[in-house]
Structure formats: structure tokens, C-alpha cells
Amino acid sequence: MALKERLGTVVSDKMDKTVVVAVENRFPHPIYQKTVSRTTRYKAHDAGNTCRVGDRVRITETRPLSRSKRWTVAEVLSHSPKAQEVST
């Protein structure tokens, strides 16, 4: 079985070893054909607490880690400019 992957933006990093990632899904409306965007928020495991708000990340599906956590952060694609200023 292939693992599911999603690309998204970190919207919250206030929990220990957990981040909330917003993934935007765009699709045409079945009747009107207008592009509709839906945002889904996933809780993902961040083992090193390296992600900050605004970072672009890739998350992969995994076994259940808690009641609401079924995704892990596979890699950080780009850091938020705001997060880079704080760390330096």
C-alpha cells in the first residue's frame, strides 16, 4: 500500500512535538466548474520540534500516534522568512 503524502503550511506549533498543517485542495465544482478550494488541517508529528508557523512541509501518513495524530512531517521544504529572523 502506498503512503499518502500532502504538501501544506504549518499554521500552529504550540504543542510539544506536534504541528498543525493546513493543506489546500483545489478542484472544479461538479456542476458549475468553478474552482473551489477546501482547506483541511492535519495534526502531524514533528519529532525534533523544528517546524515553525509559515513553513512549507511535506507530511506522510503513518500509524495512529494519538487520538488525532496520523501524519508525520517528512521534510521541511522551505522555512518562513519570519521564522528565520527569530532564529538568528
Swiss-Prot record:
Domain of life of the source: Bacteria
Pfam families given in the database record: Ribosomal_S17 (PF00366)
GO biological process terms, semicolon-separated: translation
InterPro entries reported for this sequence: NA-bd_OB-fold (IPR012340), Ribosomal_uS17 (IPR000266), Ribosomal_uS17_bact/chlr (IPR019984), Ribosomal_uS17_CS (IPR019979)
Keywords: Ribonucleoprotein, Ribosomal protein, RNA-binding, rRNA-binding
Record-level GO cellular component terms: cytosolic small ribosomal subunit
GO MF: rRNA binding; structural constituent of ribosome
HAMAP family registered for this protein in UniProt: Ribosomal_uS17_B
Subunit record text: Part of the 30S ribosomal subunit.
Family label: Belongs to the universal ribosomal protein uS17 family.
Role according to the record: One of the primary rRNA binding proteins, it binds specifically to the 5'-end of 16S ribosomal RNA.
UniProt protein name: Small ribosomal subunit protein uS17
Species of provenance: Prochlorococcus marinus (strain MIT 9313)
